[in-house]
């Protein structure tokens, strides 16, 4: 799957057994052996209240905070805007295979590919995360 692809799953079946629910899914990178590195963007704000939250990277290493912020209404693909402020957190990056995704039996909507500059900024932000697995940083 193309890096930067933005998908919407209804529902997304979580690896940890949490209750399935609709979720966005961004493909961040692909490995040679068919593994995708991806994030599950969320509208949940876990950035400390005293931190300045603006579009783009929010890194507060001393507090273990790493997030990338998309503002509501900003066009992220050629045809799509997130309806709410949306966050990608470094600690929530995980790996998946196409088999994992197909096994969910979910309705999957392809919303396009992130604009190249947004994908580059997102990856640069995540590479700064102290709470992301080192192998994931190498994949980015």
Protein language model annotation of sequence segments:
Residues 1-140:
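Conserved functional hotspots at enzyme active or ligand-binding sites that engage polyanionic ligands
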């Amino acid at each position: 799957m193309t890096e930067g692809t933005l998908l919407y799953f209804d529902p997304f079946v979580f690896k940890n057994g949490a209750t399935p629910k609709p979720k966005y899914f961004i493909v961040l990178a692909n490995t040679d052996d068919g593994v995708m590195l991806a994030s599950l963007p969320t509208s949940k704000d876990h950035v400390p209240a005293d931190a300045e939250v603006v579009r783009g990277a929010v890194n507060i290493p001393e507090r273990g905070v790493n997030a990338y912020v998309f503002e509501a209404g900003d066009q992220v693909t050629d045809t799509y805007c997130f309806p709410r402020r949306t966050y990608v957190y470094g600690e929530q990056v995980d790996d998946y295979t196409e088999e994992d995704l197909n096994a969910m039996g979910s309705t999957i909507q392809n919303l396009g590919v992130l604009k190249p500059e947004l994908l580059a900024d997102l990856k640069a932000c995540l590479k700064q995360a102290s709470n992301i697995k080192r192998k994931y940083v190498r994949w980015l």
